[in-house]
UniProtKB/Swiss-Prot annotation:
Record organism: Arabidopsis thaliana (Mouse-ear cress)
Domain of life: Eukaryota
CDD domains: CYP71-like
GO molecular function, one term: heme binding
PROSITE patterns in UniProt: CYTOCHROME_P450
Keyword Transmembrane: yes
UniProt binding sites for heme: 436
Cofactors (names): heme
Transmembrane segments: 1-21
Keywords associated with the record: Heme, Iron, Membrane, Metal-binding, Monooxygenase, Oxidoreductase, Transmembrane, Transmembrane helix
Protein name (record): Cytochrome P450 71B11
Family of the protein in this entry: Belongs to the cytochrome P450 family.
Gene: CYP71B11
Bilayer topology: Single-pass membrane protein
């Protein structure tokens, strides 16, 4: 009799499992390419996943299902599907999946960018908008930006007098880093003991975050793979360097009573409870996690934007000539260039927008995770599915943009398309709850720098190079830098 009960129980539970699996298979999942055992579709990503995903979406549709190892993923590639993800179902799709190395670098997700959608995240995000990135605060650091840009202009003037090429990748990265470190810590990095440590941290963290992490897709064995490839040890090394940089910078801030009203000052006040953060009080690890976001997002993105704008200008002489003519007409012989001048430079603003369109700096937004079952584009998206938003695909879609491969700033003439997340055909900074909160701070530096570079100097390619030789290829990462550094020769003019 006991055997009979065992058989009945076995049949009963087997039936339940079969019914559940049948229900799962009846879900209307998005279409996608065939998968290989174990690795799924990883072999189809190539060296530039944003480009590979775009090509796959042309065959399988605007919402496409992929599998990366053990991770189920969907990719949204058109304004319509992306609008559903970032607006219609933003609350259901704005959490983050756990990613091993970003978690380590953000002190176990005590940041804003990689933290899942929780009450803590909502409070910290609100704090950044209300306290850190207000228009008033951005304006308060205008003098710092002007000083650092003036220093860059002095360097370029010397290079021009010697007819020496300038590595704009390097100089614009240093400019961005100097501004951010003064704004955040009140520290002038030039010649300080922290300068070399800072450069190691910025370069290393972006490399780690932008690397393929096997641990995210293959439980257990993935960690072994990352140890073999060296990613694990590299992350640990960078984390220790970053932690030391934060500790020394905070110590310097606390010891120098003349430093005040910078961003770290605000965060330390929150640690002490002098500024309320809902029911939370920041710990030192919370502060460091937030600093990780501010430094990496603020420094790398601004520098890369400026580099790419200059790249596309030098490779399009017509556009360069038109942009410089506008800047010189508006500024005329005014010595004091101010950030507000950008409001009268309509063509330069179009050039910046077109650069964002041709090469969005974050071509694949940081993955989102569905916090519950949701239906997008008529398809079922199960809970815990990773959601990739392919901004690069939207910006290169011929159904959205005429001649998408061409660099034509005039396409933004006489329209209201902007990068503030309301136009789903143009989303360089994302949209919705996860939209970049520091746009104002970053773009203030970008505009001021470009105005100075175009007003004060003419630019030419190194000897032996033609316009056709300018390399327009990007390297892949969380942010896409130029694969080949941009070397240009500045030429002194009457405005220098």
């Amino acid at each position: 009799m006991s055997l009979w009960y065992i058989i009945v129980a076995f049949v009963f539970f087997s039936t339940i499992i079969i019914v559940r699996n049948t229900r799962k298979t009846k879900k209307n999942l998005p279409p996608g390419p065939p998968r290989l055992p174990i690795i799924g579709n990883l072999h189809q990503l190539g060296s530039k996943p944003h480009s590979s995903m775009f090509k796959l979406s042309e065959k399988y549709g605007p919402l496409m299902a992929l599998r990366f190892g053990s991770v189920s993923t969907v990719v949204a590639s058109t304004p319509e599907t992306v609008k559903e993800v970032l607006k219609t179902f933003d609350a259901e799709c704005c959490s983050r999946p756990y990613m091993t190395y970003p978690a380590r670098l953000t002190y176990n997700l005590k940041d804003i960018g990689f933290c899942p959608y929780t009450k803590y995240w909502r409070e910290v995000r609100k704090m950044t908008v209300v306290e850190l990135y207000t228009a008033k605060r951005v304006q308060s650091f205008q003098h710092t930006r002007k000083e650092e840009v003036a220093s860059l202009v002095d360097f370029i003037t010397q290079a021009a007098s010697l007819e020496k090429p300038v590595n704009l990748n390097t100089k614009l990265m240093k400019l961005s880093g100097s501004v951010i470190c003064r704004v955040v810590f009140g520290i002038n990095l030039k010649g300080s003991k922290l300068e070399n440590l800072y450069e190691e941290v910025i370069q290393g963290t972006m490399e780690v975050v932008g690397s393929f992490a096997a641990a995210d897709y293959f439980p257990i064995i993935g960690r072994i793979i990352d140890r073999i490839t060296g990613l694990h040890s590299k992350c640990e090394k960078i984390f220790k360097a970053m932690d030391a940089f934060f500790d020394q910078s905070i110590k310097h801030h606390l010891e120098d009573e003349s430093i005040k009203d910078d961003i770290i000052d605000l965060l330390l006040k929150m640690e002490r409870g002098e500024i309320e953060l809902g029911e939370f009080q920041l710990t030192r690890d919370n502060t460091k996690g937030i600093l990780f976001n501010i430094l990496n997002a603020g420094i790398d993105t601004s520098a890369q934007v400026m580099t790419w704008v200059m790249t596309y200008l030098i490779s399009n002489p017509r556009v360069m000539k038109k942009a410089q003519a506008e800047v010189r007409e508006v500024i005329k012989n005014k010595d004091d260039i101010i950030e507000e001048d950008i409001e009268r430079l309509e063509y330069l603003k179009m050039v910046v927008k077109e650069t964002f369109r041709v090469l969005p700096l974050v071509p694949l937004l940081i993955p989102r995770e569905a916090s519950k079952d949701v239906k997008i584009g008529g398809y079922d998206i199960p809970k815990k599915t990773w959601i990739h938003v392919n901004i690069w695909a939207i910006h290169r879609n011929p159904n959205v943009w005429k001649d998408p491969e061409a660099f034509i700033p005039e396409r933004f003439m006489d329209n209201q398309i902007d990068y503030k997340g309301l136009n789903f055909e143009f989303l360089p900074f994302g949209s919705g709850r996860r939209m970049c909160p520091g746009i104002g701070m970053g773009m203030a530096l970008v505009h001021l720098t470009l105005i100075n570079l175009l007003y004060r100097f003419d630019w030419k390619l190194p000897e032996g190079m033609e316009v056709e030789d300018v390399d327009l290829e990007e390297s892949y990462g969380l942010v896409c830098p130029k694969k080949v550094p941009l070397q240009l020769i500045p030429v002194l003019t009457q405005w220098s």
